[in-house]
């Protein structure tokens, strides 16, 4: 399972997975081998087959389109205020809804969990800094609906199959489309409508870039291998950032990323469902450029702004 971990092109390459090959070679005969993953691009799928030396394999791709999921990207000035407003509205419309809020760091998890608890929400938390016992208890509280909202890092989710999750909200931008798709995909597994909302800010890009640049060498990689992995990580981060800033259909972006095609508009994402007002800005732009040209280099930007605004 999680076969993408065997590929250096995958978003979560683990050198320990390469030991599978050593194990297979020691067996008296080669058994039938199956490899499963929910988040592999065509490139990664080919790499998995090559590394495992799969002979004429039967490849089954079930598709990446989850039609019951609504995708949205928001750029709030105050993320917590936006989150609080969303949860209050959700509670009014669908009381007791279960949801997951993913945060980039343990600190974010602790802060958001504390604030939501203070605001009266049924919440629990999950990250690698908690003891095994507390993580297990918190996970079971969420799975069995003793707590309605889980606030967690990406440490939460492996093997979790809670069917009635009505929303997955990312408080920070993840590092890759693979991570986002996997985490957002924990919503709506009962087939009913669910929402996948991402709160984006440019600061998320800088933080993720820092985390990638300072990531420790956990796999005894050579410097060349480590450099190649970092290049792949940066490319994935760019694709994730493009998802957060595109004006095109979000569902189409996700499916195209994983090598699938779809209609131009899905009408089930924030970009397709929002109506934009078209405005001819040519006259305004012409006034600005004309003023700058007339002023030459005699005045600074504040003076130019003042002139355009009609200041004395």
Annotate each PLM feature.
Residues 228-258:
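Short, charged low-complexity linear segments at domain edges
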Residues 29, 247, 297:
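Flexible coil/turn residues that form the inter-helical turn or adjacent wing/linker of helix-turn-helix
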Residues 82, 239, 287-290:
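Pre-recognition alpha-helix immediately N-terminal to the DNA-recognition helix
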Residues 87, 142, 244, 292-296:
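Short helix-to-turn junction characteristic of helix-turn-helix DNA-binding domains
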Residues 207, 218-223, 232-234, 250-252, ...:
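Accessory DNA-binding and partner-docking regions appended to nucleic-acid-acting proteins
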């Amino acid at each position: 399972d999680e076969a993408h971990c065997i590929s250096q092109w995958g978003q979560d390459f683990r050198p320990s997975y390469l030991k599978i090959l050593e194990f297979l070679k020691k067996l008296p005969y080669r058994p039938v081998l199956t490899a499963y993953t929910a988040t592999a691009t065509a490139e990664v799928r080919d790499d998995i087959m090559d590394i495992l030396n799969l002979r004429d394999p039967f490849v089954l791709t079930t598709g990446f389109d989850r039609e019951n999921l609504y995708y949205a990207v928001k750029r709030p000035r105050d993320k917590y205020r936006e989150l609080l407003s969303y949860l209050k509205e959700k509670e009014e419309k669908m009381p007791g809804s279960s949801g997951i809020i993913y945060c980039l760091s343990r600190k974010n998890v602790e802060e958001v969990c504390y604030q939501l608890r203070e605001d009266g929400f049924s919440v629990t938390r999950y990250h690698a800094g908690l003891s095994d016992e507390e993580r297990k208890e918190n996970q079971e509280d969420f799975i069995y609906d003793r707590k309605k909202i889980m606030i967690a890092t990406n440490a939460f989710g492996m093997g979790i199959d809670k069917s009635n999750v009505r929303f997955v909200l990312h408080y920070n931008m993840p590092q890759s489309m693979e991570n986002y798709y996997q985490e957002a995909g924990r919503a709506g597994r009962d087939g009913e409508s669910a929402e996948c909302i991402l709160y984006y800010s440019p600061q998320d890009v800088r933080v993720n870039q820092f985390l990638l640049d300072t990531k420790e060498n956990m796999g005894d990689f050579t410097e060349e291998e480590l450099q190649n992995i970092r290049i792949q990580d940066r490319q994935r981060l760019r694709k994730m950032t493009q998802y957060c800033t595109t004006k095109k259909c979000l569902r189409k972006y996700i499916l195209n990323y994983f090598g699938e095609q779809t209609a131009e508009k899905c009408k089930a994402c924030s970009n397709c469902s929002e109506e934009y007002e078209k405005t001819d800005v040519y006259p305004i732009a012409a006034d600005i450029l004309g003023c700058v040209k007339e002023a030459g280099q005699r005045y600074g930007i504040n003076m130019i702004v003042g002139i355009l605004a009609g200041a004395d």
